[in-house]
Amino acid sequence: SWVEIFSPKWRRPLLIALGLAIFQQITGINAVIYYANQIFAAAGFSTEVSRATVTLWAIGGVNVLSTFIAIAFIDKIGRRLLLLVGLIGMGVSLAVVGAAFVFIAQTPGAPQASGPTPAAIVTVVALIVFIASFAFSLGPVVWTVINEIFPAQIRARGVALATAVNWGAAFLVSQFFLSLVDLIGSAWTFWLLAVFCAVGWIWIFLRVPETRGLSLEKIQDMWGVKP
């Protein structure tokens, strides 16, 4: 029942599930995907064709290919390590994007049609690293962990709550991303997302246990609950 999932004995897995669902979104993945065209335009890709091309390959292609990394290694090196390594890659790449936008803001004149600037190329490479890091970590691994930490009798409700929170966080990020860019600038916006990655890394390191290879009974033992 819904009452059971909020009982004290399931509080820890519920908080882990909700925390993972939130960090998956507030680290900026949907903001980057939704507004990739505007981001690349601001970075110096002046034509619609160039922006469409880099969006297709830098986001779509890399996202698909990197997901196979998670599939290949999730049962070999574990969920925690993939999450922690992915967040490092995401945080560093977002910090680099922020630094690139500082350089872009200090460069006089509009982007030229002759080609992207060095700062634009750095932005694309950093965002490729960001997308790849997300695709082998927070993207698929979050939902693997969420499905593993709940026992069968409350799993459906636990996953449903995590999904609702995830979509709520995605909505807020997508609604306020451009407003945040207007308010504090592109550089500080990406640095803020990098800070969220750092906070997420610390939280996962301290709070999220490894579930690789554990039976349902052993996972329940971690919560102090007898199956």
What are these regions (language model features)?
Residues 1-227:
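Alpha-helical transmembrane bundle of multi-pass membrane proteins
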